[in-house]
């Protein structure tokens, strides 16, 4: 992978924030039945996670959610160009957080038909090859 771009850095920052929020849910869940304050802490952690999740994953200043991002991949607008670069960066990094696998696979499929630049196509092909190898290794190890 080439040097981390601004988009890569934002995805990594979001990944860390999502993991912290998700971890907070788990740590407060274990104590939620202890008393009312613990229950409220757990509720607050859940609410905070759900309120921020979409904005962190999709960088809400650019996309309103998964469907918006997927829809923009085929557009020939400035937003479409940015969406394709965001999607390529996302699958290059393969961030690990709640529901990332669904989005990863969906972007992998949708980018196959998107109008990519030569650089993006080259990066996509490398990712696709690595994914095929990963799947093959999983099948052989089962």
Per-range role (PLM):
Residues 1-142:
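Extended repeat-based scaffolds of very large eukaryotic assembly and lipid-transport proteins
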């Amino acid at each position: 992978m080439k040097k981390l771009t601004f988009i890569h850095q934002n995805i990594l920052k979001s990944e860390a924030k999502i993991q912290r929020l998700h971890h907070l849910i788990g740590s407060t869940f274990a104590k939620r039945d202890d008393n009312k304050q613990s229950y409220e802490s757990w509720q607050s952690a859940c609410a905070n996670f759900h309120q921020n999740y979409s904005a962190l994953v999709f960088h809400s200043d650019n996309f309103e959610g998964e469907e918006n991002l997927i829809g923009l991949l085929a557009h020939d607008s400035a937003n479409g160009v940015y969406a394709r670069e965001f999607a390529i960066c996302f699958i290059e990094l393969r961030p690990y957080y709640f529901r990332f696998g669904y989005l990863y696979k969906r972007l992998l499929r949708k980018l196959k038909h998107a109008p990519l630049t030569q650089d993006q196509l080259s990066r996509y092909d490398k990712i696709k090859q690595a994914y095929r190898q990963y799947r093959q290794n999983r099948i052989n190890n089962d």
